[in-house]
Amino acid sequence: NRTGGTTPQSQAALRDYLRNGLEQLINNEDQFVIVNGDLFDSFTVDPLEVVKTARLFLRWLSKTNSRALNIVAGNHDYKPKADNLSSFHLLVHMLAFSEYENQVVVHDKELGRVCGTVWCIPHMPNQDLFNVEVAKAAEMDGKGRQLLLHCNYNNHFAQNSDHSLNLDEEQTAALLRAGWTLVFGHEHVGRTLHGGRVIIVGNPFPSSVIDCIGDVDKHCLRIQGGSPQLEHTWSAHENYIEADWKDLKIPDHYKFIRVIGEASAAESAEVIKAVSKLRQSHSAYVITNAVKIEGCDLSNELAGSIEDIKVFDVVGAIMSELTEQEQNVVKGLLQ
């Protein structure tokens, strides 16, 4: 459902590219595939996309009955007080109605074993329930085991958000003491911390320009013999480019383009026209405008990846100024 920096045609091409990338990844596996949350990037997507994704998984499952698909729920797969079915659960039902239903396992309720040495905590309805599951895992013997999580890692911007959960440093330390290796979904930019025992995989393929900035290589994670190893899936080289708005002769093999540079106020219309013309003529999936107009950034690229936007939490700021009793009153009004 990415729309920032796209046209209807490039949106369709972007969806095909992401789906084809997923199919290439799972076709390399003959036993277990795990999706660690947010297979889709919103609660509901075009039903045709759900159908295409179901067909993709069914083709893979049909090759041999030894294959198993484990799907973990992410934050986009759940909506509090939702009165309609998510695309995630629609996909799950479609797979359950197939002849391969016994090869599909859904993890959307609590801490549980996925397969082999792998366990998971799916996205939970709120931070308190998530904390309960984390505490359960911290009491277990996690030595030689991997715990999949779909949440932010130590992100204070997410501390008061139930939509996007957070694992803080104290919780991380408790899980590491228990012996776990932690594997995070949710965050788009990958990194490895704590001597390789905290692995933030990132997305295996970028879906926006934001995903390309500062993250020149993308990965998936293979867990074999109880040992997690990152495997390269995508490189910014020959795929992502930053180009000055005055020189937009860009080869077609670049699929993510960030238009940069500076312009005067009088040139602002020319900038918009140049970017629009490029979007209409180039085969790139996403083209964003990061040109600065007399010191003012006209960039719309932040809209391309909502997970990376750091918004000011008004409620959290107010709560921090109140006593505990006053906070309880406010919470009661908000419920």
At which residue positions do the language-model features occur?
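Active-site environment of divalent metal-dependent phosphoester hydrolases
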Residues: 2-4, 41-44, 71-83, 125-128, ...
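Short, conserved loop/helix-junction motifs that constitute active-site signature segments
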Residues: 60-65, 137-142, 172-178, 251
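Accessory, non-catalytic peripheral segments of nucleic-acid enzymes
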Residues: 216-335
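Divalent metal-coordination and catalytic microenvironments
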Residues: 33, 38, 53, 74, ...
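N-terminal active-site segment of His-dependent metallophosphoesterases
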Residues: 1-56, 65-66, 132-144
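Hydrophobic beta-strand segments of well-ordered beta-sheets in folded domains
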Residues: 31-33, 68-70, 116-118, 144-147, ...
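Conserved catalytic scaffold of divalent metal-dependent phosphoesterases
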Residues: 53, 73, 77-173, 204
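Conserved beta-sheet core of the metallophosphoesterase superfamily
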Residues: 159-227
